[in-house]
Amino acid sequence: MSNLKIEPSASEPMISKYIHAKCAKAGVPASATFELTSGCNFNCKMCYIHSPDCEKSGGELTAAEWISLGNQARELGVIFLLLTGGEPLLRKDFPEIYTALKKMGFIISINTNGSLLCGEIEELFRNNPPSRLNVSLYGTDNETYRRLCGAPRFDKVIENIGRMRDIGIDVKINCSITPENCEDIEKIYELTKALGLHIKLTTYMYPPVRKDSGSTGFNPCRLSARQAAYYRVKYSLLSLGEDEFLRRSDSLNELFEAEDECVDEGDRGVRCRAGRSALWVDRLGNVYPCGMLAEKSCNAVEKGLAECWRTVNAETSRFKTPLKCAACKYRQLCPACAAACKCETGSFDTPPEYLCEMSRYTVDFIAKEAERIRRERNDG
C-alpha cells in the first residue's frame, strides 16, 4: 500500500530512496548521522538533546575519533552523512572534522540553527560546500526566538541563509510547531515561499527521553493532540492549495473505505530506515538505530562501527510495533513509529495514545476543511 500523506512530498532525490531501499534489504547502512556535540548556543524548550547542564554529563568524541569513525563508516558502505548536534558548528574543531569527512567522499548534510553560518564557517563552505544545510526555523521574528530559544537571533539566521544561498549552497528549512510559535504558521509559510525554500514542518514533538528518562509520554513544550492535528492540516492546506488538498482528502476517504484491517505479522516491524539502512552515532560514540531510539547497546569507539552496526541491525529486526497500529486504518497518515511508541509508552508494542488521538483529529479536520471548501465554492 502506498504511504498516502496529506503533506507536500519531500525533496529527496529518487536515487537516494532507491539506494536506501536496496541497502535495507542487504542489511547495509546507506546513511549515518554523527551527533558531534550536545552543546548549543540556543536553549530551545523542546530540544531532546541539549539542556544547560548537559555538558556536565560527560565529554564528546575528539576530532580524531570522529574521523576514524568516518573511515569505518565508509568501509561499511555509508554514502550519505548527516552532521548534527546540538549545534555542530559550535565545535572549534568542526572545520577539521568536516574537511576530513568531505575528503572521504561522503554526501554531507548538516543540521544547524543557522546562527553561525558566517565568518570562518562561511569561508569553509564557500571553498568546500556541503550537499545541503538543514536550517531550523523557530518563528518569524526575534521575539518568538527569544521566547522559544532564549536567543533573539531570527534576523541573523535569515541573513546567514542569504549568505549560504549566495554562495550556491542548497538550504532546507526544518520547523517544529509548538505553543510558542503556532500562531506564526502562516507567516512561516509565506516567508519560506518568498525565499523559495523547501520546508519540512512538523507539529509532533517526541517526549525528550534522551534528556530526561522520566519524560516518557510527556513533553512540556508540545501542542495537545488536537492542536497538533489542527496545525498539521492547516499547514497542509496552505502549502498544497485547495485543489490538491481536496484531491488528497478524496484519496484518504477511498483508502479508509477499502481498509479491511487484515494485517500480516510482517507489517509490525520497523518500516522506516532506522537500523535497517541508517545508523546514528551520539557524541560519546554510542550507536543507535536513530536519534530517538537511544537505548545504549554498543559503543563504536570500544567495539568498532562494523560490530555495532551488526548489533543494531539485528536488534532492529526484532522490534515489533503494536498489532493495533499495524491494523489501524489511519496508519498511512499517522506519524507513529517504533521510536514514537517507545518514547510515548516505554515499550514498542503499546499504542501511543497521543498519536492515536492526533490521527483521529487529523482525519476529522481534513473532512471539515474539505466540506468548507466545497460549500464555499458552491455558494460562490
Each PLM stretch: what is its role?
Residues K25, T33, L197, G214-S215, ...:
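Accessory C-terminal segments flanking Radical SAM cores
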Residues P88, L116, I177-E180, E295:
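Short histidine/acidic/glycine/proline-rich micro-motifs that form metal-
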Residues S2-R132, Y231:
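Conserved alpha-helical substructure of the radical SAM core
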Residues L61, K92, P152, E180-E183, ...:
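Residue-level signal for the nucleotide or nucleotide-sugar donor/cofactor binding architecture
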Residues S131, S136-A274, W280-L284, M292:
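Radical SAM enzyme [4Fe-4S]-AdoMet core and its adjacent flexible, acidic
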Residues N43, G77, P129, I169-D170, ...:
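Short loop/turn motifs at secondary-structure junctions
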Residues L69-G85, E353-G380:
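Short Fe-S-cluster ligation motifs
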Residues M46-Y48, I110, I173, L201, ...:
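Hydrophobic residues in well-ordered beta-strands that form the structural core
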